[in-house]
Design a protein with these regions (language model features):
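Basic, flexible Lys/Arg- and Gly-enriched helix-loop patches that mediate nucleic-acid binding at interfaces
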Residues: 1-241
Length: 241
């Protein structure tokens, strides 16, 4: 059966649909020897689909990992400059997993890795408004008026943010410690939100995605999601099979 190419790549655990579109655009995908184009349809049972020159097959068993990404680690599976990536931290995992979304190089915390492209696409889809919670250490004292601005939504270069939930944990004259929950996944969003209200982020750690928590997982360590966590996450993002 013919399907859109990005959907096939997602089903085969190559990448989320969004990431698959980028791969097609970058010329990394071919169908029957010809470069793929966005919008192309194919049949996995009939066509020879290659990604980076390697023929893809039907998906292996679905795997879901939780990683506590440390700072100074790239949210990619490879790096031409030899820097540490999340792939270096999941040795022993045979499944071809990929990160769902990203944490920037200087941020740490909860990162989901999976070979379930449909699940990844659902988590990243802006329409799902999946909550993501961060611990934030910022410079200076965050005044109530700026908390209110963040909670109402704030204008960034790429548009207004959805309302955030901000909990002040503790503060001094020099720093503020906050728990911030957002429902989007824009690039460096929390850092940019804080900069817009006049505060630089000193430390940023994601501790929760929807109902999945980092818990006591050590920095640089990973674990497999429990069946209960997988079931709950699938239910929240739209009853994915």
């Amino acid at each position: 059966m013919e399907e859109r190419l990005q959907k096939i790549l997602a089903k085969c655990g190559i990448a989320s649909r969004r990431q698959a579109e980028d791969m097609i655009f970058e010329g990394l995908v071919t169908v029957n020897g010809a470069p793929a184009v966005l919008g192309m349809k194919a049949d996995l049972d009939r066509d020879h689909i290659k990604v980076r020159g390697k023929l893809i097959h039907t998906v292996e068993s679905k795997v879901y990992l939780i990683l506590n990404k440390p700072e100074k680690c790239l949210t990619t599976m490879s790096d031409s400059e030899g820097r540490m990536t999340v792939k270096n931290l999941i040795k022993g995992v045979k499944a071809k997993v990929f990160p769902v979304g990203r944490l920037d190089y200087n941020s740490e915390g909860l990162l989901i890795l999976t070979n379930d492209g449909d699940m990844a696409n659902a988590i990243l889809h802006p329409g799902k408004k999946i909550p993501k919670t961060y611990l934030v250490k910022a410079d200076g004292f965050l005044e109530a008026r700026n908390v209110e601005r963040l909670e109402k939504g704030i204008k960034l270069d790429d548009g207004m943010t959805l309302p955030a939930k901000v909990k002040q944990l503790k503060y001094t004259k020099a720093n503020s410690w906050l728990e911030i929950t957002i429902h989007e996944g824009r690039k460096r969003q929390v850092r940019r939100m804080m900069e817009r209200v006049g505060h630089s982020v000193i430390k940023l750690k994601r501790i929760r995605i929807n109902g999945i928590s980092l818990g006591r997982l050590e920095s640089g360590a990973f674990r497999y999601m429990t069946p209960e966590e997988i079931k709950k996450l699938k239910k929240e993002v739209g009853n994915i099979n």
